């Protein structure tokens, strides 16, 4: 193929915004029942509706919740753990529209199981132990009857006969992960309390289950205010396992002994993360095969590994796969299923045979493909940052077999900041990154200090320093790449969503390095966020900024909206009108302030969208609007036809 010389940003790309919006689904929770595998799909072409899909042993696939039923819970606002499979083949799921639990039998329409008016449910497990009268679910319930900011969380038992509910445990701000021992005689669960987030400190509880289904003898067996516990799980032999970061890394442990003599044994101590930041319910990184061995995934140096730990020798054996990210791992007798992402193909639901170790893709997140020659693969970089420390990022060079940039030019750079902020970016194939690299942009996706996957100390770098450390690392990643001659420092943009949007706004306000930026539902006013957010994150800022309202002066000082006189760069803001995590008033206020300053600015508000865009039309419009904006600021004309964006002061 003959290379055509065109300015960076002008390159024609096969990766269109319409392709990304319409052909990409959101893969979520995985569940197993015997040889059956089920998972959730968020479908942009169905207005973001979440569908539970079942794949039987014979390979047939079918939707379990028909339209208009939407299997998504608003518990903790971010949801997760929205469905469970029952022994009789039925599905129980939370319906987004009314947040009630519905039972969908293999034949017939879903029928409401619960009938509350202000309840939300998540993380349900069946409790239908043979030879007992119990036929119920045990789940987390949020009661929003009196207040959403003070919603009451409990563990409840829900009868599968008539939906009646019985409170099993209460008295803490948050509950998650109820896990029943295989014989039904004990229940484990997690709690945490304000101001902690689950990755700061959480507590693992264990109780006996009486014959009448009530809990007795509840006691703490691990965790605390400075130790994070993740995913309690029972082995087939009835031994409780969990992940803890007590050593600085989320490692696996098992509880040996009973009562006061119980002790936690580290199974395979190593500088690796077997746990994750519990942003949603139902997360899973390990399980047990038919021989009682642990099949697990862990993260080292920003990449996921798959492994098996022998139940007797505790020796860890890595399992080679083509996947660099592995999540939602569920384990059956002789197989496992997970969501896997490679560096060259979209994420997929994958089944691995634990005997042959062969992998089968059951469902790809995208029905579209792109020639490998167009794919930019991540280069992991470690770069110097403030305080003599090092930070991490993933660099993607521009790649398009049909084009090259002018000989005397270096590519423009887009610096991406992930959301959370207690989260991480991964090297897995991402259409949203390939959209830019195939058009001639370089991209660096920054795992700034505070990101997960590098141990507790790295995660704690953001304690009290949000808006400082993340911004420093974003700037220093760009400087590092410019210093080695990979990008043009005079044509740099920064973009991010949610917490990444806050990093973007801070960088454009408190630094003068970037020429422009794009904030997707980003935070401009920390004081407003502290006053007007949901319960799960209502004290999150205590750790990231300082206690509210005692540290109000610091909240003011870290809020970009208060210092618009320091702005010197254009920006585009993209916001959902139904966002409860970051109210749209924040985007409007930031837009008004930037416009008054006389800087180029654009604002797009999307009806029906919340915190994160789910509808195909929104996803397409947002991507194209951002590209159009960069074209106007950097002085290039994107290939193809793009609807113009109204840009004030330009």
What function would you assign to each model-found segment?
Residues 1-36, 42-51:
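Sequence/structural signature of beta-propeller modules
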Residues 26-29, 40-41, 50, 62-63, ...:
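Non-catalytic accessory segments flanking enzyme active sites
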Residues 14-21, 62-73, 109-115, 164-169, ...:
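A short beta-strand motif characteristic of beta-propeller blades
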Residues 56-59, 105-108, 159-163, 209-213, ...:
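Short loop/turn segments that connect beta-strands within beta-propeller blades
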Residues 23-36, 70-91, 118-137, 171-187, ...:
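Conserved beta-propeller blade repeats
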Residues 195, 365-490, 497, 531, ...:
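Cap/lid segment of the alpha/beta-hydrolase catalytic domain
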Residues 448-650:
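Active-site-proximal cap/loop segments of hydrolase catalytic domains
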Residues 41-51, 71-77, 93-101, 115-121, ...:
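A flexible loop/linker signature enriched in serine peptidases of the S9 family
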């Amino acid at each position: 193929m003959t290379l055509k010389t065109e300015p960076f940003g002008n390159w024609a790309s096969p990766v269109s915004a319409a392709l990304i919006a319409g052909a990409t689904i959101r893969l979520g929770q995985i569940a197993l029942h015997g040889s059956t595998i089920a998972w959730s799909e968020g479908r942009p072409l169905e207005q973001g509706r979440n569908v539970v899909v079942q794949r039987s042993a014979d390979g047939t696939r079918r939707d379990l919740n028909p339209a208009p039923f939407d299997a998504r819970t608003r518990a903790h606002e971010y949801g997760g753990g929205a469905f469970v499979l029952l022994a009789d083949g039925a599905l129980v799921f939370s319906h987004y529209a009314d947040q009630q639990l519905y039972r969908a039998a293999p034949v017939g329409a879903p029928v409401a199981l619960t009938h509350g008016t202000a309840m939300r449910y998540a993380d349900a497990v069946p409790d239908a132990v043979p030879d007992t009268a119990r036929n119920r679910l045990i789940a987390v319930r949020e009661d929003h009857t009196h207040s959403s900011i003070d919603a009451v969380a409990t563990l409840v038992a829900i009868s599968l006969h008539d939906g009646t509910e019985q409170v099993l445990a209460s008295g803490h701000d948050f509950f998650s992960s109820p896990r029943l021992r295989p014989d039904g005689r004990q229940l484990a669960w997690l709690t945490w309390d304000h101001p902690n987030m689950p990755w700061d400190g959480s507590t693992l509880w264990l109780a006996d289950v009486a014959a009448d289904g009530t809990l007795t003898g509840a006691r703490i067996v691990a965790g605390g205010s400075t130790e994070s516990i993740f995913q309690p799980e029972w082995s087939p032999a009835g031994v409780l396992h969990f992940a803890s970061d007590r050593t600085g890394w989320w490692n696996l442990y098992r509880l040996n002994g009973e009562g006061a003599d119980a002790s936690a044994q580290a199974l395979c101590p190593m500088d690796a993360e077997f746990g994750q930041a519990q942003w949603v319910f139902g997360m899973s990184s390990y399980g047990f095969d038919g021989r009682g061995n642990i099949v697990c995934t862990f993260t080292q140096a920003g990449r996921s590994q798959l492994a098996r730990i022998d139940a007797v020798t505790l020796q860890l054996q890595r399992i080679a796969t083509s996947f660099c990210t592995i999540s939602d791992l569920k384990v059956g007798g002789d197989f496992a299923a997970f969501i896997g992402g490679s560096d060259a193909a979209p994420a997929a639901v994958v089944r691995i045979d634990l005997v042959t170790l062969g992998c089968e893709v059951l469902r790809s997140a995208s029905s579209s493909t792109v020639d490998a020659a167009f794919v930019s693969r991540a280069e992991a970089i470690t770069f110097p940052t403030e305080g003599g420390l090092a930070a991490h990022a993933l660099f993607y060079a521009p790649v398009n077999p049909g084009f090259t940039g002018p000989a005397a030019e270096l590519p423009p750079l887009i610096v991406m900041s992930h959301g959370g902020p207690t989260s991480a970016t991964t090297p897995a194939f991402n259409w949203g990154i390939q959209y830019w690299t195939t058009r001639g942009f370089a991209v660096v996706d920054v795992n700034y200090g505070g990101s997960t996957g590098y141990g507790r100390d790295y995660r704690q770098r953001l304690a009290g320093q949000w808006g400082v450390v993340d911004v420093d690392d974003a700037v220093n990643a760009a400087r590092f790449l410019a210093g080695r001659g990979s990008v043009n420092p005079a044509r740099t943009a920064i973009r991010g969503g949610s917490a990444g949007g806050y990093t973007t706004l801070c960088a454009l306000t408190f630094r003068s390095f970037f020429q422009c930026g794009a904030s997707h539902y980003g935070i401009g006013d920390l004081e407003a966020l502290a006053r007007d957010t949901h319960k799960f994150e209502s004290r999150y800022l205590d750790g990231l900024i300082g206690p509210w309202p005692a540290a109000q002066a610091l909240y003011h000082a870290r809020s970009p909206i208060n210092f618009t006189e320091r702005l010197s760069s254009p920006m585009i803001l993209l916001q959902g009108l139904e966002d409860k995590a970051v109210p749209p008033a924040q985007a409007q206020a930031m837009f008004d302030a930037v416009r008054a300053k006389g800087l180029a600015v654009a604002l797009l508000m999307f009806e029906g969208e919340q915190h994160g865009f789910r509808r195909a039309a929104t996803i397409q419009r947002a991507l194209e609007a951002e590209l159009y904006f960069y074209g106007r600021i950097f002085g290039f004309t994107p290939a193809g036809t793009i609807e113009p964006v109204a840009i004030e002061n330009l």
